[in-house]
């Protein structure tokens, strides 16, 4: 009975869920690069507002990720800065 339960659970797990893990790791690495290079500046801009920087990512390919840094308040997310991140060369630059 337990084997049947485990088999049915494994059957319904989408195979795409495993493929997205690599993409999530790349996006997390890109966000960490932005935080490492620009995090203190963003925190200083928000000092006294009781807000913290929040990050969103857009995966382009295994090397390039776009990152938006902003704030989330009362159901609204507002972007402060956009970054172009090259994970392969560990570089992050502000987008113009």
Language model features with spans:
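Sec-dependent signal peptide recognition
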Residues: 1-7
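Short, surface-exposed linear patches
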Residues: 19, 48, 87-93
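Short, non-transmembrane alpha-helical segments in secretory-pathway proteins
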Residues: 19-54
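C-terminal partner/receptor-binding element of secreted or periplasmic proteins
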Residues: 28, 91-96
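Exposed beta-strand-loop-beta-strand "reactive/processing" segments of non-cytosolic proteins
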Residues: 46-87
């Amino acid at each position: 009975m337990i084997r049947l339960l485990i088999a049915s659970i494994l059957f319904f797990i989408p195979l795409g869920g495993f493929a997205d893990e690599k993409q999530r790791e790349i996006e997390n690495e890109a966000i960490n690069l932005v935080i490492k290079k620009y995090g203190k500046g963003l925190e200083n801009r928000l000092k006294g507002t009781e807000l913290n920087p929040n990050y969103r990512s857009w995966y382009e390919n295994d090397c390039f990720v776009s990152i938006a840094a902003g704030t989330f308040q009362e159901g609204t997310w507002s972007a402060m800065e956009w970054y172009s991140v090259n994970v392969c060369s560990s570089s992050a630059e502000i987008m113009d």
